[in-house]
Amino acid sequence: MYKRQRIGELIFNTAMTGYQEIITDLSYTDQLICFTYPQIGNTGVNKEDLESIAGGCSGIVIKELSKTESNWRKDNDLSSFLKEKNISGIANLDTRKLTRILRDNGSQISAIVPEEYSKKQIEALFDSFDGIKGKDLAREVSTREAYIWKEPSYRKETKKNSYKVVAYDFGVKHNILRLLVDRGCEVLVVPAETSAEDVMKENPDGIFLSNGPGDPEPCEYAISAIKKLIEINIPIFGICLGHQLLGLALNLKTEKMKFGHHGANHPVQNILDKTVSITSQNHGFTISEESLNDDVIVTHRSLFDKSIQGISSKDGRVFSFQGHPEASPGPKDIQNLFDKFIKNMQSQKSLTNAKKK
């Protein structure tokens, strides 16, 4: 595999499928991914399943690279793709042992380096990286210019646009945008630093806060904008980093987790109706339990560690989810959250139209 110097926070991911979507998820910026599944690369890489164009993680650590790829949609092999995206990789490691180390000791600052690197070079590399906490990575990966996303899910026809959604790009996954288009949304993707005033000039029916990398607390520009948008009577839906930023805008706090949640098999309970969904997860920060206030309802909790997975305003107009309802990869159990967002926009439009009469 392509091997060049890469340093980042080493985490482990327990998903058995979807390595392409994981590798190209911008939420993994400045991270190295240790895959617990023993063989990676067996389906190659295709253009349709990318979650970003630029690539996401800094590097991958695997047990075994598949010698063959079998997939009728394949455009490329994994090793060539990593080189194309400048993502480092290392194979033939005991990933089970490495995962146990990370589980017991937490995520670690780690590096992949060429064999000829000296101890002095390695020490200098580690001195150059002090972790993800306190870093605003959303600003780095966000689009520089606004654009309209029109692509629906694979082999789905585009529906007539019924709702206009402004989607904040903090590192947005493509499948999130596809699912919004599938539901009849005209999606305008805007840079992370877009002000609330500029957003409202677009006359949106709803605001979407995307996933993304890094620590949410330094993103003061986004928190400030979200606070202003909450005061306006408009539906808001956040995922992953967007969930955390919404929490901060609602005067909650966030904290770094020991090793985070990274996988496609995480059970989450809906506190309101007691249903359980298996979800895709990818986050290293969480909303602090101690910071909860009376203005926020906790809607979902992880059944692994009871951490907060979903929050909502009392009227349900503003809500968010920590995991990834869009999956990609993973189960689709909780994609109904997108439908809830659509219903919120529909209700708000009906109310607004009634007031005009």
Predicted regions and their residues:
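Proline-centered loop/turn at the N-terminus of a beta-strand
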Residues: 88, 164, 235-237, 253, ...
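Active-site-proximal beta-strand elements of phosphoester/diester hydrolases
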Residues: 164-168, 279-280, 319-323
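Cysteine-nucleophile active-site neighborhood
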Residues: 205-206, 210-281, 286, 330-348
